[in-house]
Amino acid sequence: MWKFLKEMPKVELHAHLNGSLNTNSLQDLAEKVYGNTSEEFSHLCARFVNFEKDSNLDKCFEKFAFVHELTSTAAGLQYATELVIRDFANDNIQYLELRTTPKANKNYLRRDYLRIVLDTIKRSRKKYPNILVKLLPSINRSEPVAVAEETVALALEFAKTDPDLVVGIDLSGIPTKGKFTDFCGALDLARREGLKLVIHCAEIDNPPEIKEMLSFGMSRCGHGTYLTEEDFAQMKAANIPIECCLTSNIKSGSVSSFEEHHLKRLMESDAPRVVCTDDSGVFDTSLTNEFLLVVETFNVTRDQCIDLTLEAVKHSFASEQERQQMALKVEHYVNSLQTD
């Protein structure tokens, strides 16, 4: 089954740039850009993917400071982006929607940050021709609304110059920070101007905010861990898929066991859902591994894995032609198995 899943042309719809660098890539990045190959750095990398039993969302977010330091220069950000694309390509991901929060520091402005990432995506096409990469700039709800408005303005600016690359906006960050309603103006502008919306919703048990988010609407829901049965029904009626990230939810402490993960209820009710990694580096996983967990936990068949992949194709922000090409790749893969 692992070989089948590994070779399957998969679709990744929920991947954060800075969280998707695995330990090998972190060491490659440190060595190439910063010349750091010390034993101390190796220990830092090991600690980066190590989770205690009492881990929670706050402890997970603390880990990102380590990677943000490595991507705080133009060269670091550029190489990190290339490494993430490389790692997903090596896992036979045929389509990747990468999300990242534009950052500003002494080395670059937020516009520069997005330009570096976009330019790297373009350059990577020749090196990794079998993976199609799109970008979703992220609003960090921990930051001021003015920063969110700048992020949306930049996303719209680059969506005009690179419409095949910038396809949506993500709202993420520490879920206990900021008020969702404060960001609705910026999100609504993005939606009115044609960008798709992905909202990290119900990561924590906050019923009033969950209701606000569902009322506001979204193209896809990130996590949905604390959605009620009524919320699930509302999502299904609106055909809003929930991005299920099993390892992430377990290691962050938001779900107590794989068996209790809400993906089970979504599959039983045939509600829209997609399997994703979230932060494959931080959580030391891959999309192949996530599918294997789904297979082993819920007794999912090969055909169901194919169906889950085709569902991800359907809910991607790719163009209609790109979705057809992705579905064709999956079909060719299935046909190749039948002729073996």
Swiss-Prot record:
Zn(2+) binds at residues 14, 16, 200, 278. Its EC number is 3.5.4.-. Disulfide bonds: none annotated. Monomer. Binds 1 zinc ion per subunit. It comes from Drosophila pseudoobscura pseudoobscura (Fruit fly). The active site is at 203 (proton donor). InterPro entries: A_deaminase_dom, Ado/ade_deaminase, Metal_Hydrolase. GO terms for molecular function: adenosine deaminase activity; metal ion binding; N6-methyl-AMP deaminase activity. This is Adenosine deaminase-like protein. The keyword Repeat does not apply.
